[in-house]
């Protein structure tokens, strides 16, 4: 989609698909900020103050994205108060999610972080099987989960193995089925 040092000229609206939004640390590691889902936007911070995006957005599944020119959007906002309120609502929702994620990662152990992420995936990216179990539709590697919760792939493997032994979930390279979402 775009790199963090690229000049921001568009507000991106994700119609369908998934985007990983991240910053690159000094040691070239990716620090994942969030996973964008259908209907979410990115680039709103540039509406008021033009500049670089400040992060990288990368498609991790087939995606359809609507691009809105920021200069045209600024004019619409200037002329339409209710539209402005809607954009503010998007920004406030994103801020609240970021604060929750930051607090979760700051004060919780590895297993709790992984559970928090899996709960989010069950809520947004799963389907209910006839058995009542939840299958996460989005294929994820343990490294991807680790990136999302700021832990190593090895730590994710240990957590998933432990949860599988406790009959909370079953996983392999192609599927992740949650038997007991209430225990996440």
What are these regions (language model features)?
Residues 34-92, 96:
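Cyclic-nucleotide recognition modules
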Residues 16, 40, 71-72, 143, ...:
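Alpha-helix/helix-capping structural signal
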Residues 1-61:
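Cyclic nucleotide-binding regulatory domains
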Residues 12, 34, 58, 66, ...:
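Residues that recognize and position ribonucleotide moieties
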Residues 82-148:
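Polybasic "coupling" helices that flank or enter modular domains
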Residues 123-184:
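Phosphate-/nucleic-acid-contacting segments
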Residues 11-14, 65, 73, 145, ...:
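Hydrophobic packing within well-folded, soluble alpha/beta domains
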């Amino acid at each position: 989609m775009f790199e963090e040092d690229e000049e921001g000229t568009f507000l991106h609206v994700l119609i369908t698909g998934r985007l990983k939004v991240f910053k690159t640390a000094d040691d070239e590691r990716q620090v994942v900020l969030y996973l964008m889902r259908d209907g979410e936007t990115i680039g709103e911070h540039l509406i008021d103050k033009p500049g670089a995006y400040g992060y990288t957005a990368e498609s991790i599944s087939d995606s359809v994205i609507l691009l809105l020119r920021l200069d045209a959007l600024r004019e619409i906002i200037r002329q339409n108060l209710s539209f402005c309120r809607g954009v503010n609502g998007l920004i406030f929702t994103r801020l609240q999610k970021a604060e929750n994620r930051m607090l979760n990662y700051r004060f919780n152990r590895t297993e709790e972080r992984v559970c928090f992420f899996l709960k989010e995936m069950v809520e947004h990216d799963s389907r209910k099987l006839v058995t009542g179990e939840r299958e996460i539709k989005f294929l994820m590697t343990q490294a991807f989960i680790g990136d999302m919760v700021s832990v190593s792939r090895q730590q994710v493997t240990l957590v998933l193995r432990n949860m599988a032994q406790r009959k909370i979930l079953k996983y392999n390279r192609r599927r992740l089925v949650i038997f007991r979402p209430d225990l996440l």
